[in-house]
């Protein structure tokens, strides 16, 4: 039954009716974002189209005060704070986590992951802040240090 529901959500053009009306059929066939399954790297169609044709004044708008210029959200609920390592090296942010073998309801399990992110130009390591939320979400972000008006 879940397979039918998933197929229905993916194959239903009503979800993207406004997107299809504004674009031609051939343009939609060439847009690979329409065929991608939702995931952490899949961009909303409206946002993707806006990114392809940004408004004229978008390049002139600086980030708002307190608005993040760079942000990473990771679900690390299975790891203790001491299991997580955050490093920067030559413009890259490296996040690693690993815990030893533990017993769970199915037997023994051990987990680990490594994520690398390229920091945007002009971002300094000292401006990074990391917060581990109570719900297990790790937030690493760089805030605008120069108070823009």
UniProtKB/Swiss-Prot annotation:
UniProt keyword annotation of Nucleotide-binding present: no
Which CDD domains does the protein's record reference?
ACD_HspB3_Like
Residue ranges annotated for the sHSP domain, each copy included: 47-149
The record's subcellular locations are: Cytoplasm; Nucleus
InterPro entries noted in UniProt = A-crystallin/Hsp20_dom, Alpha-crystallin/sHSP_animal, HSP20-like_chaperone, HSPB3
Q: Which UniProt keywords apply?
A: Cytoplasm, Nucleus, Stress response
**What is the top-level taxon of the source organism?**
Eukaryota
Where mainly located?
cytoplasm
Q: Which GO terms describe its cellular component?
A: cytoplasm; nuclear speck; nucleus
Cytoplasm as a keyword? yes
Pfam family, any one: HSP20
Q: What does this protein do?
A: Inhibitor of actin polymerization.
- PANTHER family noted in UniProt: HEAT SHOCK PROTEIN BETA-3
Membership in a protein family: Belongs to the small heat shock protein (HSP20) family.
Under what name is this protein listed?
A: Heat shock protein beta-3
**The encoding gene:** HSPB3
């Amino acid at each position: 039954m879940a397979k039918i529901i998933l197929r229905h959500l993916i194959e239903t053009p009503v979800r993207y009716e406004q997107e299809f009306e504004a674009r031609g059929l051939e343009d939609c066939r060439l847009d690979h974002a329409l065929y991608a399954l939702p995931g952490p790297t899949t961009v909303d169609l409206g946002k993707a189209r806006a990114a392809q044709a940004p408004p004229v004044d978008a390049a002139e708008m600086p980030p708002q005060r307190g608005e993040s210029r760079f942000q990473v959200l990771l679900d690390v609920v299975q790891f203790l704070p001491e299991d997580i390592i955050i490093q920067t090296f030559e413009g890259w942010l490296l996040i690693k986590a690993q815990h030893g073998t533990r017993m769970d309801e199915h037997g023994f399990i051990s987990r680990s992951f490594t994520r690398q992110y390229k920091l945007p130009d002009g971002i300094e390591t000292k401006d990074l802040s990391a917060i581990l939320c109570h719900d297990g979400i790790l937030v690493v972000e760089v805030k605008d240090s120069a108070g823009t008006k």
